[in-house]
Amino acid sequence: KLIIAGGGLLIILALFHLSFWSLFNWQEELPKLSAENSGIMQMSAIGFVCLFLSLGMIFISFRKEIANTKLGQALLFTLAIFFLIRTIAEFIFPGSSIELGVFLAICTLVFLIPATVKKI
């Protein structure tokens, strides 16, 4: 069930990243950056949308394979590490949010628990 929840979280995160243009007023804010940095911000957001959406669909569609194979365990552990690093980064960089930090910590656990639970 946590694997399905993780897939759902990834899809929600894809949609969240898709909203960055309006949520963070990028039409006005990005021109303040150099063209290169503006492009990097937008390409990173698009990349995360594609990655999160794809992984979310894979986790939901192939939950048994994710739960019962070494590759699946590696993917779960990789995402747990990703979200752990992202949680730590939330409090290092300006504009941190306790609420987002808690959400990211929950994401870490959603992927870490099934990655570390022994199968019988």
Language-model features, listed with the residues they occupy:
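Structural signal for membrane-spanning alpha-helices in multi-pass inner-membrane proteins
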Residues: H17, F59, E90, F111-A115
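Membrane-interfacial loop-to-transmembrane alpha-helix junctions, especially the N-terminal start
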Residues: I3, T69-T78
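Non-cytosolic membrane-interface motifs at loop->transmembrane helix junctions
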Residues: L30-I40, N68-L71, G95-L104
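Membrane-helix boundary connector in multi-pass membrane proteins
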Residues: A80-L100
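Core segments of alpha-helical transmembrane spans in multipass integral membrane proteins
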Residues: G8, I12-W21, E36-K64, F77-F83
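Membrane-water interface at the C-terminal end of transmembrane alpha helices
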Residues: A105-I120
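N-terminal membrane topogenic signal
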Residues: K1-G7, T116
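Juxtamembrane "helix-exit" motif on the non-cytosolic side of transmembrane helices
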Residues: L23-E29, R63, I88-G95
